[in-house]
A protein has these predicted regions:
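Bacterial Sec-dependent N-terminal signal peptides
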Residues: 2-6, 16-44, 146-161
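Outer/extracellular conduits and scaffolds centered on Gram-negative outer-membrane beta-barrels
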Residues: 11-12
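Extended beta-sheet lipid-handling architectures
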Residues: 40-43, 56-58, 73-75, 90, ...
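Generic short beta-strand segments
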Residues: 40-48, 74-79, 105-114, 140-144
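N-terminal glycine/threonine-rich, aromatic-flanked beta-hairpin/loop signature
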Residues: 52-94
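Short, solvent-exposed coil/turn segments at beta-strand boundaries
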Residues: 64-72, 96-101, 127-138
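Contiguous, well-ordered beta-strand patches that form the walls/edges
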Residues: 78-131
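Edge beta-strand at a domain terminus
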Residues: 87-94, 98-99, 134-161
Length: 161
């Protein structure tokens, strides 16, 4: 009888050890939210100026980590006719994760860039929204560049390489 009790106790302890040390994905910590979206995203960029489509091209946006919960977005250079707007950065976009979706929003960001002639131009980016899901991003923002009289509203849909 004592052997049966000892055997039962041994089996119960081994079962507890195996259950407690199982190889479950729940045991591994999730990567920081910013690390989950960092990369180069290539896709379609549509720019609207005064409610008219001015540009519809394939572009590559860069998303870089600034902290565990925020990223910078580098917008590529683009041109219309004789005008070129240099690449610029929107910094410190805070990210929030809900389920499998990660979103980032910034009400307004301003900075300066140098144009092709070397002149410094101010820019203001407003209503920035980034929505990440798996390896896809959809981004929207409005841009006021230099002394341009109209806002340029951009929508970008890209896939991470």
């Amino acid at each position: 009888m004592k052997t049966k009790s000892l055997t039962f106790a041994l089996v119960a302890s081994l079962a507890t050890v195996f259950v407690a040390s199982s190889c479950s994905s729940d045991d591994e910590p999730e990567a920081p939210v910013a690390a989950q979206v960092v990369g180069s995203y290539t896709g379609n960029e549509v720019i609207m100026v005064d409610n008219d489509e001015s540009s519809n091209e394939t572009k590559t946006y860069e998303i870089t980590k600034t902290s565990d919960t925020s990223v910078d977005m580098t917008v590529p250079e683009w041109g219309m006719g004789m005008m070129t707007i240099p690449s610029f950065v929107v910094k410190n976009i805070p990210l929030v994760k809900s389920g499998n979706a990660i979103t980032g929003n910034v009400a307004s960001y301003s900075g300066t860039v140098k144009n092709a002639k070397g002149d410094e131009k101010a820019y203001v980016v407003s209503n920035v929204t980034l929505m990440f899901s798996d390896k896809t991003v959809v981004g929207t923002y409005s841009l006021k560049y230099g002394n341009m009289p109209f806002l340029m509203t951009t929508t970008f849909t890209g896939t991470r390489k």
